[in-house]
Amino acid sequence: MAAAETQSLREQPEMEDANSEKSINEENGEVSEDQSQNKHSRHKKKKHKHRSKHKKHKHSSEEDKDKKHKHKHKHKKHKRKEIIDASDKEGMSPAKRTKLDDLALLEDLEKQRALIKAELDNELMEGKVQSGMGLILQGYESGSEEEGEIHEKARNGNRSSTRSSSTKGKLELVDNKITTKKRSKSRSKERTRHRSDKKKSKGGIEIVKEKTTRSKSKERKKSKSPSKRSKSQDQARKSKSPTLRRRSQEKIGKARSPTDDKVKIEDKSKSKDRKKSPIINESRSRDRGKKSRSPVDLRGKSKDRRSRSKERKSKRSETDKEKKPIKSPSKDASSGKENRSPSRRPGRSPKRRSLSPKPRDKSRRSRSPLLNDRRSKQSKSPSRTLSPGRRAKSRSLERKRREPERRRLSSPRTRPRDDILSRRERSKDASPINRWSPTRRRSRSPIRRRSRSPLRRSRSPRRRSRSPRRRDRGRRSRSRLRRRSRSRGGRRRRSRSKVKEDKFKGSLSEGMKVEQESSSDDNLEDFDVEEEDEEALIEQRRIQRQAIVQKYKYLAEDSNMSVPSEPSSPQSSTRTRSPSPDDILERVAADVKEYERENVDTFEASVKAKHNLMTVEQNNGSSQKKLLAPDMFTESDDMFAAYFDSARLRAAGIGKDFKENPNLRDNWTDAEGYYRVNIGEVLDKRYNVYGYTGQGVFSNVVRARDNARANQEVAVKIIRNNELMQKTGLKELEFLKKLNDADPDDKFHCLRLFRHFYHKQHLCLVFEPLSMNLREVLKKYGKDVGLHIKAVRSYSQQLFLALKLLKRCNILHADIKPDNILVNESKTILKLCDFGSASHVADNDITPYLVSRFYRAPEIIIGKSYDYGIDMWSVGCTLYELYTGKILFPGKTNNHMLKLAMDLKGKMPNKMIRKGVFKDQHFDQNLNFMYIEVDKVTEREKVTVMSTINPTKDLLADLIGCQRLPEDQRKKVHQLKDLLDQILMLDPAKRISINQALQHAFIQEKI
């Protein structure tokens, strides 16, 4: 026993030096990464070589020489020492310790100081000369070997060689550290001073260089032997607080061999050693991180974890009584700079570790490729299959050493990713830990819960540094649960205000001293902020929901009040989130009736008011211009002339009395199949003809009075007498009946059919009487000026209602234009008429001449399949014409129509062009538009290929023209322009739908 004591005393200075040198190397982070793990034994030898080599630079005291001699016998003696070690540590007399301390302290510190300075000045980047700190760490690592034996075997299986060297190293370290408690204390103080100096000078370099240095240090650690690394890491974590350690050791002591007693002594000195070498922590935690970071490993270790968690639980309850914050083992896997705080004492709860959040994140990222490699090796290792006894032993040791680490990690600044992973993994295993904090988990919002997923493991650095509190929320939930109930009140308020002041208040990045504040307070502060965040979020969302509900309630009431004439469902409103189509239609119909009531006699006045808005010069200029352009609707060729006694009709002989020309009695039909109308004749024994309205493609129309119904005025449409026209007339009859049946209340502004009959082999349809069509209205009231915006808005509402009914009945009108829209006497109500071109939506034969040319949609021209969109296009052209009095697209040919449409909306989409049957008439192989125009000089057709067509027509300028509009009207014109833009989309798929049009602001908002 005495021999063992003296040997350990002699070995002590060298071991201290080895430790110090290794820690400096690791702190500088210069280790090469590409040396493989299986070379560990060679490096062990090298390490001893280094130790002896560097003794030149150190004190060569008598003890050292003696020690060198004794060193040879270490291997033989280590087994005996394991047994007597426990009594050794008790037997050490304080006098010997003091004596030893006094002997070596001064010399030691002097030389180490010089070495550290030299290292700082010269070898910071190279790391070739191993300093005193490095040597200390080296001895420290070799001393930790025995405990890590199992991990060593897991890595390479070379257990026997490892054990001999590891035990030898361990004996050195144990005795060594018993005798040098005081010296290591003073030395650690000295080193702490140095390191803070060094940190100041080194700050910039570390941040810039940290990726390189860390990877280097990793490599050297790796090459020094993975076994040592893991073992030293394992042990170094044990010793944060002596009390804690002692208690947990008592708990676990049963499962340990006598050699484990050494841990107690080592722990004391190692807690001081940790102060000396913060980067040891880095390497340790990194190694630990390897275990918990990889999902594969998590699965592999879940069994271990389950059994561990039981022991953990008992230990936790113990430490809870001491009010020490303890986290689950997985929480200790902090990485990189998180563990850098040099001046930490075991008793304190350090609040911060990182130089700054960003470098920490960088280090995480830079390490990852290597970690994956190591992880995969580890997961395959046999350590998972160790005997239960051995596994329990290593587990208990591991757990014991993790407790201080847990405390160290409880700072708000550190939240390792492994923490998240292992927590998730533990919840899968349903370990007792989950039962410690049910409320904590339940209170988590879905968003936060989601952040645990593997994908979120690698959160962005920005996020990690932005919310340090959130990062380690779950970490301290266990011990916190009881404490919270006790100290909730004032402390929570205090900590909340603290957090709000400055979220980075406690970080070492400001170079501040660590405040001595209880870690339980820390934990509370963190938890309460999170809780408050969640509650605030929930409250905020609840308020938003209420506001939305209130808003729509109010809007619904508002819309119900504003439409008193029409019953509407309680929740109905066109402004609610999703008003039903019926509600929209009700509102629009009510608007129309209101307009009708208010404007019975004001139509002409409103048109005059619009005329007055035009400037005199513009009026003159435009009228002169118009004289030059031929009007296609002049009376001479207007088939909708208002009066039957026009010169043309008289010349044709229509309107002469029968008595004057009795030969006409048998000649009812002219050469083209039209019925020869005679004023005064009676049709079907009841309709007394008194006027002639006009002649269309399919028919001519007369005005009559119904003798059977108290001379009620009607319009009688007499279809041309030929097979095709009869067929067309019957089709129109069918559609009209269908539409009328679908609209019994006459809300949808399609012409009402009263009845039909045959007269002289002509099919006759009897309609409600309407005075004029919109073409005539425009000529009479709004030539080149158009109608008032109020009238246009009302007409547009009614037209959209008519389209709605058509769509409900699956009918395409296919000839909407001002000529086919009739108005009543007061010009307030319009009706869509002339369904001679109408068809069922499924029977849409592709023909390029469907619909009157000026109102023909582009899909018809290129021969693409079409649907209700063609009627919407026609309505858009009609509305423009109603407001401006000008035709929107006065194309001379289909090709010209396409050119004019593209001048407004830009080039037609290629996708649409390709679907056109007649695309080759208007587009080349590259889908460039071929504009066919007649040369003004030669009067021959010339083709201009236009690869791009930029929209040049300004719709708004055309709509406003030279009017000086008041603000309310200007707003409506802007809305009309927006509506027309959506109606006149070249691609019918993008064109506005009828429901959308009915909800448009132009339709909904009153003037």
From Swiss-Prot:
State where ATP binds.
T693, G694, Q695, G696, V697, F698, S699, N700, V701, K717
UniProt feature, compositional bias: Acidic residues? 518-533
GO cellular component terms, A-Z? catalytic step 2 spliceosome; kinetochore; nuclear speck; nucleoplasm; nucleus
Q: In which tissues is it expressed?
A: Ubiquitous.
Where does this protein have compositionally biased stretches of type Polar residues? Answer: 1-10
Active site positions: D815 (proton acceptor)
The terms under GO molecular function for this entry are: ATP binding; protein serine kinase activity; protein serine/threonine kinase activity; RNA binding
Pfam families reported in the protein's UniProt record: Pkinase
Q: What is the effect of changing F658L?
A: In a breast cancer sample; somatic mutation
Q: Which location does the Swiss-Prot or TrEMBL entry give for the cross-link Glycyl lysine isopeptide (Lys-Gly) (interchain with G-Cter in SUMO2)?
A: K99, K111, K117, K170, K177, K593, K659
Its domain of life reads Eukaryota
What the entry lists under PROSITE patterns is as follows: PROTEIN_KINASE_DOM, PROTEIN_KINASE_ST
Q: Modified residue Phosphothreonine is at which positions?
A: T385
What is the annotated quaternary arrangement, including any partners? Interacts with CLK1 C-terminus. Associates with the U5 snRNP and NCOR1 deacetylase complexes. Identified in the spliceosome C complex.
Protein's UniProt name: Serine/threonine-protein kinase PRP4 homolog
| Species in which this protein is naturally found | Homo sapiens
Q: Give the taxonomic lineage as stored in the record.
A: Eukaryota, Metazoa, Chordata, Craniata, Vertebrata
